[in-house]
């Protein structure tokens, strides 16, 4: 069972300076948001999160929101320690939880997994009358037949993280409390506002308009206050558009607003690593190393941490730095075997290590990743499509690699920083794979808007 981030809420109060307007907005939200139920005998967690790694960013934002609201949240990749018996820890975590949230989308892909998770949580709800089972749907995909007897909360308007009125409904559902008429009216108002802002942020990224992202953030409002989802989406957009200084400024404010949020720290480290000035790499590794030691070992944290070790290798040429990068990607992939991002990087770094044993390992990783991502483009998903291309590159199928890389660039033309990262990786791999000049030119054509490898 792919579950929960587990970090216990503590009594430390983060310092924050509110202006009058911000305080009024927060009080309005708190007026309608229910508090976590007191933990009873044998209970350790208010809520248990069940999910697949393909939805990890959304779940991480949900974790941040719940933790910020004072809920004790079980999330496997935080709770689990090396050597733990996975099934036993998950079973204990579920038994010790007051509620369970099943996060599902079409990208989950594995109907058998959905059925098992659904039946497990449904059984808990039948056996324990106080247990609240809350299924959550992240897109407009059709629900499986076996799930038709239960109402799913619809977060299809919030692909980047929970927000708006649906978040308020989720909080009520996991505490077993119905919405009052006033809360229902408030939730409906927030749905429209949060959806509009998310669409404006997405449009600004697509239109290469970082100034609009900054203006939207500066305007603020309740939708920016209740969840870090909008702020993180805007900051990630700035990173994609190469505005790392602005992203870091935005993330500093978000960290003060959401002091327990993990996603903001991940993005801070990513922006520092991409900026690459002076002490940036050291500071990025300090953030990520601290998260790692604190038990935050989800694929996103491990993936960015591994990336910084690759950056370090690029400067040092020290093979141990490259091995550290590959090992972190491999650790993440073994923790979440459906996470294609860490899987493809474990494969690629193994190629760069360039021994017969490592090349065999790379082939095994690449085959596993191809089972996840398939062989065709994924409309609207740059990174998954680029990963399909990278698998073909590793398999030395250069025509197919070029086709998929071109498709990836075409669906995210504004994301130049993402293109640069993908092209640099392809260059490193081709240095080891030794394609013919003709085959290299095919791959190069997809990135003709970027300088060639130095």
Question: Each predicted region: which residue ranges?
Answer:
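C-terminal interaction surface of TIR/SEFIR-family domains
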Residues: 1-68, 132, 137-215
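Conserved BB-loop
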Residues: 61-92, 107-115, 154-158
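Amphipathic helical hotspot of TIR/SEFIR-family domains
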Residues: 89-92, 96, 101-141
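Amphipathic alpha-helical repeat scaffolds of TPR domains
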Residues: 189-203, 224-236, 258-275, 296-315, ...
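Helix-turn-helix repeat elements of alpha-solenoid scaffolds
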Residues: 201-215, 236-249, 273-287, 317-326, ...
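Alpha-helical junction/boundary sensor with strong preference for TPR arrays
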Residues: 220-224, 258, 288, 295, ...
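Alpha-helical linker/edge segments of TPR/alpha-solenoid repeat scaffolds
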Residues: 275-280, 312-318, 351-362, 398, ...
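TPR/TPR-like (Sel1-like) alpha-helical repeat modules
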Residues: 333, 347, 351, 366-368, ...
């Amino acid at each position: 069972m792919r579950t929960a981030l587990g970090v216990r809420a503590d009594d430390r109060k983060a310092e924050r300076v509110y202006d009058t307007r911000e305080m009024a907005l927060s009080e309005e939200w708190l007026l309608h948001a229910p508090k976590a139920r007191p933990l009873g005998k044998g209970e350790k967690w208010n809520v248990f999160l069940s999910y697949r790694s393909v939805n990890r960013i959304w779940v991480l934002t949900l974790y941040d929101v719940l933790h910020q609201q004072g809920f004790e949240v079980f999330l496997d990749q935080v709770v689990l320690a090396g050597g733990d018996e996975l099934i036993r820890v998950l079973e204990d975590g579920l038994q010790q939880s007051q509620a369970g949230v099943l996060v599902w989308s079409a990208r989950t892909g594995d109907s058998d997994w959905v059925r098992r998770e659904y039946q497990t949580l449904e059984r808990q709800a039948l056996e324990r009358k106080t247990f609240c089972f809350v299924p959550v749907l992240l897109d407009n995909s059709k629900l499986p037949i076996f799930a038709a007897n239960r109402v799913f909360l619809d977060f299809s308007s919030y692909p980047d993280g929970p927000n708006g009125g649906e978040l308020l409904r989720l909080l009520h559902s996991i505490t077993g409390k119905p919405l009052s008429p006033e809360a229902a009216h408030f939730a409906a108002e927030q749905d429209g506002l949060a959806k509009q802002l998310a669409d404006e942020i997405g449009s600004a990224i697509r239109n290469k308009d970082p100034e609009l992202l900054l203006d939207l953030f500066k305007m603020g409002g309740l939708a920016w206050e209740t969840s870090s989802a909008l702020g993180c989406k805007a900051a990630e957009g700035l990173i994609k558009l190469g505005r790392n200084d602005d992203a870091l400024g935005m993330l500093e404010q978000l960290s003060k607003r959401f002091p327990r949020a993990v996603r903001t720290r991940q993005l801070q480290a990513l922006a520092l690593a991409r900026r690459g000035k002076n002490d940036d790499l050291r500071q990025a590794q300090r953030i990520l190393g601290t998260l790692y030691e604190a038990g935050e070992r989800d694929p996103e944290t491990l993936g960015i941490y591994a990336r910084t070790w690759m950056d370090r290798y690029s400067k040092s040429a020290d093979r141990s730095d490259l091995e550290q990068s590959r090992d972190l990607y491999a650790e993440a992939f073994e923790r979440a075997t459906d996470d294609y991002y860490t899987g493809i990087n474990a494969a690629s770094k193994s190629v760069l290590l360039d021994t017969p044993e490592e090349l065999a390992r790379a082939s095994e990783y690449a085959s596993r990743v191809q089972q996840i991502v398939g062989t065709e483009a994924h409309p609207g998903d740059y990174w998954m499509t680029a990963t399909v291309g990278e698998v073909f590159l590793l398999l030395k199928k250069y025509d197919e690699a070029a086709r998929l890389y071109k498709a990836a660039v075409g669906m995210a033309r504004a994301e130049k920083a993402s293109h640069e990262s993908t092209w640099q990786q392809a260059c490193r791999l081709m240095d080891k794979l030794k394609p013919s000049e003709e085959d290299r030119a095919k791959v190069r054509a997809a990135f003709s808007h970027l300088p060639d490898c130095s």
